[in-house]
């Protein structure tokens, strides 16, 4: 069973019960390596003179190597549509169409700082950079930047630029059972961590650190009156995304992807 503990656009914390450590690690690896994401793969730089509408001439040579700029462009998180095809699986046979490729352009005249907001989607205006203020390069007077880019779908196992998540971690569900008769200051923990209380009776009170409370860490130092147990069939996960997908979209896809891979494995074993 899956329960969401905390949810934001780009962050989620949830619990899953009734699974083994091997399954938990499979979920973690899927979240890191196997989520589709849109990222810039091809960059074409215009080299030579550029003229503005008033006839002023600019030099399109950049202060950084083209390879460095291309790498920076590839690492800019882009809004992602999971309905897009992978280029090698598209009906266009890898030529690049609107179903598998998003084209972008940058046309900037110096002196100016070039930011990710200058990366303009051409054929799909909704798939813009997540953060408009990521710096790319600084142009001096008389310099210009004119590039066209192609973004395609990929997975984190192929390159870090296609990795949606960061900080993917999990731990066992843990409970701290306090004997009220043996630990005099038990009420201190109840006052400081009210959301962590999961049960209470006349003689005992039980906390969990599924909902984090820094004061619970002090219970590890108590000499008596505290029993700490871990459940190796229930896990607490948390991760955040770079904004290309929401956290709930990422989790939903990961679970479906894992189920699909298990089904494919079972089919291959039965043949």
Curated annotation (Swiss-Prot):
Main location: cytoplasm
UniProtKB keywords: Cytoplasm, DNA-directed RNA polymerase, Nucleotidyltransferase, Transcription, Transferase
InterPro entries xref list: DNA-dir_RNA_pol_insert (IPR011262), DNA-dir_RNA_pol_RpoA/D/Rpb3 (IPR011263), RBP11-like (IPR036603), RNAP_Rpo3/Rpb3/RPAC1 (IPR022842), RNApol_insert_sf (IPR036643), Rpo3/RPB3_RNA_Pol_subunit (IPR050518)
One GO MF term attached to the UniProt entry: DNA binding
Reactions catalysed, as given in the entry: RNA(n) + a ribonucleoside 5'-triphosphate = RNA(n+1) + diphosphate
Top EC class, one word: transferase
Xref: SMART domains: RPOLD
Disulfide linkage: none
Keyword Nucleotidyltransferase in annotation: yes
Any single GO BP term: DNA-templated transcription
Pfam entry (one): RNA_pol_L
Subcellular location: Cytoplasm
EC number: 2.7.7.6
GO CC terms: cytoplasm; DNA-directed RNA polymerase complex
NCBIfam families according to UniProt: PRK00783.1 (NF001988)
Biological function: DNA-dependent RNA polymerase (RNAP) catalyzes the transcription of DNA into RNA using the four ribonucleoside triphosphates as substrates.
Subunit structure comment from the entry: Part of the RNA polymerase complex.
Family of the protein in this entry: Belongs to the archaeal Rpo3/eukaryotic RPB3 RNA polymerase subunit family.
Protein name (Swiss-Prot/TrEMBL): DNA-directed RNA polymerase subunit Rpo3
Organism: Picrophilus torridus (strain ATCC 700027 / DSM 9790 / JCM 10055 / NBRC 100828 / KAW 2/3)
């Amino acid at each position: 069973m899956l329960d969401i503990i905390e949810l934001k656009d780009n962050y989620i914390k949830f619990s899953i019960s009734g699974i083994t450590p091997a399954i938990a690690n499979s979920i973690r690896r899927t979240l890191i390596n196997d989520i589709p994401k849109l990222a810039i793969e091809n960059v074409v730089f215009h080299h030579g003179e550029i003229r503005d509408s008033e006839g002023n001439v600019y030099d399109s040579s950049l202060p950084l190597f083209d390879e460095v700029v291309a790498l920076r462009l590839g690492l800019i998180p882009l809004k992602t549509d999971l309905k897009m095809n992978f280029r090698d699986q598209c009906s266009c046979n890898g030529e690049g169409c609107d179903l598998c490729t998003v084209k972008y352009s940058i046309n900037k005249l110096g002196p100016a700082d070039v930011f990710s907001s200058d990366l303009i989607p051409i054929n799909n205006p909704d798939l813009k950079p997540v953060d408009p203020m990521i710096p790319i390069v600084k142009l001096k007077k008389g310099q210009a930047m004119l590039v066209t880019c192609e973004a395609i779908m990929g997975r984190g196992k192929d390159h870090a630029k296609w990795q949606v998540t960061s900080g993917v971690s999990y731990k066992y569900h843990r409970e701290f059972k306090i004997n009220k008769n043996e630990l005099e200051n038990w009420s201190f923990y109840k006052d400081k961590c009210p959301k962590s209380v999961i049960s209470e009776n006349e003689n005992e009170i039980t906390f969990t650190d599924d909902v984090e409370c820094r004061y619970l860490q002090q219970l590890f130092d108590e000499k008596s009156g505290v029993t700490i147990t871990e459940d190796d069939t229930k896990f607490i996960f948390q991760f955040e995304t770079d904004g290309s997908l929401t956290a709930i979209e990422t989790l939903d896809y990961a679970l479906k992807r894992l189920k699909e891979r298990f089904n494919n494995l079972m089919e291959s074993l039965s043949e």
